[in-house]
């Protein structure tokens, strides 16, 4: 969670002032961070989770299995991934999501936050 917290400090959110940080732990033990990056054309903004996942996918094509993602925002507790991010994380086999609910860390199996999901094995 400390990596996600640190990533939230790098967010670019001049319009909403809603800072989010994410940290991904891969099966290979690597950690990748991301923060939300807003754009004046709001639809072009990218969430912290997708930012971290694209960094992971680019950094090491052999280590693209997500063991867990931690998500943090100083603006909201808990801060869960949005629907688009959940589907994006699903692509890389995310197993667990960790959020800080203000009183401590909460862990959720990925299937609990995206039940009956569609993934690569469905094609």
Can you say where each PLM-predicted feature lies in the sequence?
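Short beta-strand scaffold segments in enzyme catalytic cores
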Residues: 17-26
């Amino acid at each position: 969670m400390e990596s996600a917290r640190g990533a939230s400090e790098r967010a670019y959110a001049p319009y909403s002032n809603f800072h989010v940080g994410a940290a991904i732990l891969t099966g290979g033990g690597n950690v990748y961070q991301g923060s939300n990056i807003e754009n004046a054309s709001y639809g072009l903004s990218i969430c912290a989770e997708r930012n971290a996942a694209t960094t992971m996918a680019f950094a090491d094509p052999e280590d693209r299995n997500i063991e867990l993602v931690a998500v943090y925002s100083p603006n909201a507790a808990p801060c869960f991934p949005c629907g688009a991010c959940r589907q994006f994380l699903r692509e890389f086999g995310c197993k667990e999501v960790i959020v800080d609910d203000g009183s401590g860390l909460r862990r959720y199996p990925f299937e609990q936050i995206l039940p009956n999901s569609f993934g690569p094995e469905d094609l």
